[in-house]
């Protein structure tokens, strides 16, 4: 079995698993894959794992080396190594892998501000994975929550969300969680006559208030159908709006 050693819920029952291997974003111990500087290394599927590690890839092999992407690469690498796949083949596979559209895609980096399209983050869990990646965020969020609660998402990431620009039908659900658990976060509600206009207004407002070091992150934590055809349209309008900024 292969588990994520950085996940406390998973590791809480690890002692019940036979022949356990794991992966971590940190330097690996015996029986783990992990990261050393910019290398992804294996100390699990080699003869002398007590004293040695082998490189199976580098972070440069990944299209977007944010933490959860690295974690996914480690999981895939561990499965491949367990099947006897050579490290060269794993590195090639990671280099050739094309991430899905609208999933933590860097749209633009300008004036020390990074613009990220994660429109595919249609629920709190996915949005949380994106928020945890960055330190200082102007967060564009909202849409159809479909009964989801935002409390845990906000509590976990309250120190990262500098500004929240809220859109969509269930934006007040997010606003209430922010007011309760992240009272220092600036909250603004963005309106418009159409979904396209709303997103353009959100992007323009983000441009006005962003600071050096900010990440402007579209990670709505909600479905899109209240204002858009689907998450892809939402993400594309965001991308187009960002690229049109002067």
Language-model segment annotations:
Residues 1-5, 140-141, 160-169:
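Short internal beta-strands
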Residues 4, 188, 216-221:
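Short beta-strands and strand-loop turn motifs
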Residues 7-8, 46, 144-146, 170, ...:
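Short glycine-rich anion-binding loops that position phosphate/pyrophosphate groups of nucleotides
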Residues 7-12, 28-30, 147-148, 171-176:
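Short, charged/polar "capping" segments at the starts of alpha-helices
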Residues 11-59, 100-103, 107, 134:
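Extended acidic/charged loop-beta regions that coordinate divalent cations
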Residues 57-161:
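Nucleotide phosphate-binding/pyrophosphate-handling subdomain across enzymes
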Residues 153-214:
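C-terminal helical cap/extension that packs against the catalytic core
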């Amino acid at each position: 079995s292969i588990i994520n050693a950085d996940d406390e819920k998973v590791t809480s029952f690890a002692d019940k698993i036979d022949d356990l291997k794991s992966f971590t974003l940190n330097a690996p111990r015996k029986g783990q894959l992990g990261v050393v500087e910019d290398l992804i290394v294996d100390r699990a599927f080699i003869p002398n794992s007590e004293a040695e590690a082998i490189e199976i890839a580098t972070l440069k092999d990944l299209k977007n080396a944010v933490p959860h992407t690295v974690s996914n690469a480690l999981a895939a690498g561990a499965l491949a190594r367990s099947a006897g796949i050579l490290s060269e083949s794993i590195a090639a596979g990671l280099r050739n892998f094309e991430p899905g559209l609208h999933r933590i895609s860097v749209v633009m980096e300008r004036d020390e501000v990074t613009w990220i399209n994660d429109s595919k983050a249609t629920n709190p869990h996915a949005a949380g994975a994106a928020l945890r990646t960055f330190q200082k965020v102007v967060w564009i969020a909202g849409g159809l929550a479909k009964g989801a609660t935002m409390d845990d998402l906000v509590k976990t990431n309250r120190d990262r969300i500098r500004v929240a620009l809220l859109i969509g039908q269930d934006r007040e659900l997010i606003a209430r969680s922010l007011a309760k658990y992240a009272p220092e976060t600036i909250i603004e509600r963005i309106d418009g006559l159409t979904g396209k206009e709303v997103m353009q207004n959100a992007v323009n407002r983000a441009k006005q208030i962003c600071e050096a070091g900010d990440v402007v992150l579209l990670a709505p934590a909600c479905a899109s159908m209240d204002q858009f055809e689907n998450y892809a349209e939402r993400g594309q309008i965001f991308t187009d709006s960002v690229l049109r900024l002067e």
